[in-house]
Swiss-Prot record:
Residue numbers binding 1-deoxy-D-xylulose 5-phosphate: K128, S154, E155, S184, H207, S220, N225, K226, E229
Gene that this polypeptide is encoded by: dxr
InterPro entries (alphabetical): DXP_reductoisomerase, DXP_reductoisomerase_C, DXP_reductoisomerase_N, DXPR_C, DXPR_C_sf, NAD(P)-bd_dom_sf
Species, as recorded: Pseudomonas putida (strain W619)
Protein name: 1-deoxy-D-xylulose 5-phosphate reductoisomerase
UniProtKB keywords: Isoprene biosynthesis, Manganese, Metal-binding, NADP, Oxidoreductase
Length: 396
């Protein structure tokens, strides 16, 4: 019988975290929750602690810690509360932990995710920004520590499933011609370009196929999410940017494809539900029930494909340029995008200005080597300062 695996879920109150806990709860004989982290939804984190009884819960600061401790005491729950980035790194690298779900959104997830990698854990990577910001450093840490890195983004998980087990020999060595990264096109795929200046945060967050958090929903609407995924794919699979092609596929049934030199194209299909890649990574190399309904091909009936419109979605072009430039450019892209998306959600800028701000910041910030994590965060900080300066001049 398989030994019970102890899991740390970073970002437990978000969409990926909750889906992870749903899969874990279906297999109590296989998985036990070791630690959970949350950021603003402390009441929800409390409810999850009562339900899953983790050894630890991590919150951002002392005020949240006091509130959570009081709730845990009232519920008779023995979970110990830790604080801040140090607490996140502690539960990510703890000797008792077998696997870490890295689902904290944005740059905030980089250090704890890297802590899990450096401790040699099985890392379920949902935090694409960690690889976007620090790709070379991150992958070197994976090689050095012997960590097992399994992608959670549905597209990268699909690619992982379509590649041979020895793809780390090099894509050309295993006969791969190119990777086809699918994109739904988001909620504005057919919106007249002239109308994009008037779309609201609520419209941007109403994705036609996926249930996601607000930040990633806006990224999907701008297609920056696909741009970040392109950069992530380059690092995960050691692919040159020109070997990763984005294909718009509105139904979100084919999650990505791998094109081989013999003319074969392998694809992974499934209903658009994140529990599928989560279950795949949790159980890899085995398979477990995820709770996702079987795919009904007769109900789908048709699958459509088209090329992405980079005039409508300039974020995709900017991300590809950052991937080609390398060095600090992806970290700058990511930081500027985080500030821009937050400003859009706060109604301080219009939707097309997300790309406009990012392009200006990329033009202003020189591309420099990032040989250390400190250098990565320095580039990130400079980009955020330039973004805020742009907002002061152009924001509402």
């Amino acid at each position: 019988m398989t030994a019970v695996q102890r899991i740390t879920v970073l970002g437990a109150t978000g969409s990926i975290g909750l889906s992870t806990l749903d899969v874990i709860a279906r297999h109590p004989e296989r998985y036990q929750v070791y630690a959970l982290s949350g950021y603003t939804r402390i009441d929800q984190l409390l409810a999850l602690c009562v339900l899953h009884c983790p050894a630890y819960a991590v919150v951002p600061n002392g005020e949240a810690a006091v509130r959570l401790r009081e709730g845990l005491a009232a519920a008779g729950c023995a979970t110990e509360v830790l604080e801040g980035e140090a607490g996140l790194c502690e539960v990510a690298a703890a000797p008792e932990v077998d696997a870490v779900m890295a689902a904290i959104v944005g740059a905030a997830g980089l250090r704890p995710t890297l802590a899990a990698v450096e401790a040699g854990k099985k890392v379920l990577l949902a935090n694409k920004e960690a690889l976007v910001m620090s790709g070379a450093l991150f992958m070197e840490a994976v090689r050095r520590s012997g960590a097992v890195l399994l992608p959670i983004d549905s597209e990268h998980n699909a690619i992982f499933q379509c590649l041979p087990g020895d793809y780390d020999r090099g894509l050309s060595q295993v006969g791969v011609r190119r990777i086809l990264l699918t994109a739904s096109g988001g909620p504005f795929r057919e919106t007249p370009q002239a109308d994009l200046a008037d779309v609201t945060p609520e419209q941007a967050c109403a994705h036609p196929n996926w249930s996601m958090g607000r930040k990633i929903s806006v990224d999907s609407a701008s297609m920056m999410n696909k741009g970040l995924e392109l950069i992530e794919a380059c690092w995960l699979f050691d692919a040159a940017p020109d070997k990763v092609e984005v294909v718009v596929h509105p139904q979100s049934v084919i999650h990505s494809l791998v094109d081989y030199v013999d003319g074969s194209v392998l694809a992974q299909l499934g209903n658009p539900d994140m529990r599928t890649p989560i279950a795949n990574a949790l159980a890899w190399p085995e398979r477990i029930d995820s709770g996702v309904a079987p795919l009904d091909l007769f109900a789908i009936a048709r699958l459509d494909f088209q090329a992405p419109d980079e005039l409508r979605f300039p974020c995709l072009r900017l991300a590809r340029q950052a991937a080609e430039a390398g060095n600090s450019a992806p970290a700058v892209l990511n930081a500027a995008n985080e500030v821009a998306v937050e400003a859009f959600l706060e109604r301080r800028i219009r939707f097309p200005e997300i790309a406009g701000m990012i392009e200006q910041v990329l033009a202003q910030e020189p591309v420099v080597p990032v040989p250390s994590l400190d250098a990565v965060f320095a580039a990130d900080q400079r980009a955020r300062e330039l973004s805020r300066e742009w907002l002061r001049r152009h924001g509402r």
